[in-house]
C-alpha cells in the first residue's frame, strides 16, 4: 500500500483514480466528465462505421453521403448520431469547464489535471479549424441534391490528360466540365446539366491554353455555352479561335455555381466574376470588368482586341452603306413640312426638360473612373439603374448601387 502512494507513477494514478478527493457538496454537475467519455466513444464508433461507406474524393464525396443516407441500413441514424454527438460534446466541454471554475477544481491537488485539460481544450479548438479552405467554401457552399445528381455523370468532372495540366497550373477546380464538344451527346448532357443553374463559366483553348471567363444568370449557362461555341454570337475572339483551331480543341468549364434569387445575389455573381477576371487574367476577355465597363479607359492591348473583330473590308462596307446616296425631292419636302408644322414646346414641358437635363458626375467608390453626364437619364442608362434611384441618391448620401457616388455638376 505504501508503494502505491510513494511510487511516482503509481502514486499519480492512486491520487486520481483510487484516493481521489471529492468535495462534500458533489452534485450532478460532476456527470459531465463521464458524459464526455460516452460522447467520445459514440463519435469513434459512428465515425468508423461512416468511414466504411464514405469516399473522400471531390468527385464522389456528396454522392457517398447520399448513399449513406439512402442505401446503408440505419445510415441516416449513424450520420445524425455522429453529427449531433459532436455538438453535444462541445456543450458538455463548456459545462465541464464551467463546473470546474465554479467549484475551484483548478486548485491543488488538481492543478496538474486542470493544466492537462486546458491543453486538450486548446488542441481540440485548433484541430477544429485545420483544413478549412475559404476558396473551396465559396465554390461549394450552395451545392444541393440536384447538383449531386449531375455529378453522378463521370464525364462532367473528370478532366482529360490535355486539360488537367492547365487546371493544375492555375489551381482551378471546376464544378462541371465538358470536353469532346463535337459529340452531339455532350451537347445534350450540357443542356440537361447547365439549364437550372447560374454561375461563373470558363472556355479553354487546349492548344494555346488561352481562356475566356464569364458569368450567367439562372437558366443562361447553357445559352452562353451555345452562344460562344456553336452560334458564334458571343465573344468574337472566342469565335475566331474556334473557327481557327476547331471545336474539338476547346473545353467548357463551370468554375462556380452562384445562387440567383434577388439583386443581392446578382451583385455576388458580378463580384465573383470580377474575382476570377482579376485572378486568372483571361486573354480572350476584352473588358477587365464584369459589369458595365462604361468610362473604362482601354489600354492599347484591349483596343487591339476590339479591332480584331472587324476586318478592313468590313469597315469599308459599313462606311459605304450611305456613301453617294441623296434624298429625293419628295423626301426633302416631307421633312421640311414636318419641321414647319411641329408645335412649339409648352412652358410646362420646358420646365420638365430643364429638371431632367441636370448634369451629374458619377465616380467609383474608390475615387476612380470619373464620368460626366449632361442629364440624369443618360447617367441612369450608363450604370443600368432607374432615374428615381439617382434622384433618391442625390437627396440622400449620394451612393448608387453600393458601387458609385453621384454628384450634381454646378
Curated annotation (Swiss-Prot):
Task: Please report the PTM annotation for this entry.
Answer: The mature protein may arise from proteolytic cleavage of an in-frame translation of COB exon 1 plus intron 1, containing the bI1 open reading frame.
| Keyword vocabulary terms for this entry | Endonuclease, Hydrolase, Intron homing, Membrane, Mitochondrion, Nuclease, Transmembrane, Transmembrane helix
Q: What is its EC number?
A: 3.1.-.-
Q: Which residues form a coiled coil?
A: none
Q: Which residues form the GIY-YIG domain?
A: 196-286
Q: Name one GO cellular component term.
A: respiratory chain complex III
Which branch of life, at top level?
Answer: Eukaryota
Q: Where is this region: COB exon 1 encoded?
A: 1-131
| Topology class, membrane | Multi-pass membrane protein
SUPFAM superfamilies listed in its UniProt record: DNA-binding domain of intron-encoded endonucleases, GIY-YIG endonuclease, Transmembrane di-heme cytochromes
- Provide one Gene Ontology biological process annotation: intron homing
The listed locations are: Mitochondrion; Membrane
Q: List the disulfide bonds.
A: none
Similarity comment text for this entry: To endonucleases of group I introns of fungi and phage.
Q: What is this protein called?
A: Probable intron-encoded endonuclease bI1
